[in-house]
Curated annotation (Swiss-Prot):
GO terms for cellular component: cytosol. Homotetramer; dimer of dimers. It comes from Synechococcus sp. (strain CC9902). Pathway: Amino-acid biosynthesis; L-lysine biosynthesis via DAP pathway; (S)-tetrahydrodipicolinate from L-aspartate: step 3/4. Its EC number is 4.3.3.7. Catalyzes the condensation of (S)-aspartate-beta-semialdehyde [(S)-ASA] and pyruvate to 4-hydroxy-tetrahydrodipicolinate (HTPA). This is 4-hydroxy-tetrahydrodipicolinate synthase. Disulfide bonds: none annotated. SMART domains: DHDPS (SM01130). Keywords: Amino-acid biosynthesis, Cytoplasm, Diaminopimelate biosynthesis, Lyase, Lysine biosynthesis, Schiff base. The record marks 54, 117 as: Part of a proton relay during catalysis. It catalyses: L-aspartate 4-semialdehyde + pyruvate = (2S,4S)-4-hydroxy-2,3,4,5-tetrahydrodipicolinate + H2O + H(+). GO terms for biological process: diaminopimelate biosynthetic process; lysine biosynthetic process via diaminopimelate.
């Protein structure tokens, strides 16, 4: 028995990799390496690529860099994957402008984070997201709730009020609980495609109605994550659980400190010279790097 029929549509597939941004030795964006990495991720099972999200270090990229990166990835993968642009801001006017520009350069969708630092009330969040949706009415949007970083949480009831915006099609749930998925499904029904925003919660979230994951770990474990999701969707829950349990050490190692510090180190260990994160982020401490290297080695043997 497959579970596909009970799930919402998957507007961006099952696995969207939140791409790192490669930097060269001078700290400049390495657009050629970004293109190579994008093609590799698609070959490893990614249905979509998110450019300039949290993992892509958007806070330390200029908007000019972000647009050029989006264009480079879009050109690199062509029609083989959907490309989403991170266009969120705590300024509604800036988010509107960024989303329009992303649509103009060929993005397939935009990830729009809940505004950070200024902590708007729920009424303000509804106005914010409605303005973005109306500014780019043909661009599919994924709302992004990550209160641990933003200091602000969007309620399921507020999301439900936005369901009259036809291009708000999905939601990245990164509050750290499966209860968020349940609340969203009760409020919005199957109209809203919910993606796990936490690799370690992908399988639990699938079990309560999520359709996929916006993944960091898929940089280095794309086939294994694909196998886990496919097994679950095909009703092979035991196989999915076994794959999930094999991946848990990797998930822990990749989030032992602030993302994307560990995943950039993991890519370096695997031969991808993506460079260190831009300050104020730092390189991975040596002890954590050793643990990560051992975890990657063990995963390759499974």
């Amino acid at each position: 028995m497959t579970l596909s029929a009970s799930l919402s549509p998957q507007p961006f597939g099952r696995i969207v990799t939140a791409m790192v941004t490669p930097f060269d030795s001078s700290g400049a964006v390495d657009f050629q390496l970004a293109a190579r990495l994008a093609r590799h991720l698609v070959e490893q099972g990614s249905d979509g690529l998110l450019v300039c999200g949290t993992t892509g270090e958007s806070p330390t990229l200029s908007w000019d860099e972000q647009l050029k990166l989006l264009e480079a990835v879009r050109e690199a993968v062509g029609s083989s994957a959907q490309v989403l642009a991170g266009t969120g801001s705590n300024s509604t006017s800036e988010a509107v402008k960024a989303t329009r520009e992303a649509a103009a350069v060929g993005a397939d969708g935009a990830l729009v984070v809940v505004p950070y630092y200024n902590k708007p009330p729920q009424e303000g969040l509804e106005v914010h997201f409605r303005a973005i949706a109306e500014a780019a009415p043909t661009l599919p949007l994924m709302l992004y709730n990550i209160p641990g970083r933003t200091g602000c949480h969007i309620e399921a009831e507020t999301v439900a009020c936005l369901m009259d915006c036809p291009n708000i099609v999905s939601f990245k749930a990164a509050s750290g609980t499966t209860e968020e998925v349940t609340a969203l499904r009760l409020a919005c029904g199957s109209r809203l495609a919910i993606y796990s925003g936490d690799d370690g919660l992908t399988l639990p979230m699938l079990s309560v109605g999520a359709v996929g994951v916006v993944s960091v770990a898929s940089h280095v474990a794309g086939p294994q994550i694909r196998a886990m999701i496919d097994a679950y969707v095909e009703g092979e829950v035991g196989a999915a659980l076994a794959q999930h349990e094999q991946l848990i050490p990797l998930f822990k190692a990749l989030f032992a400190t602030t993302n994307p510090i560990p995943v950039k180190a993991a890519l370096e260990i695997n031969g991808w010279s993506v460079g260190a994160p831009r300050p104020p982020l730092s390189s991975l401490p040596e002890a954590m790097r050793t643990t990560l290297s051992n975890t990657l080695s063990a995963l390759r043997q499974t």
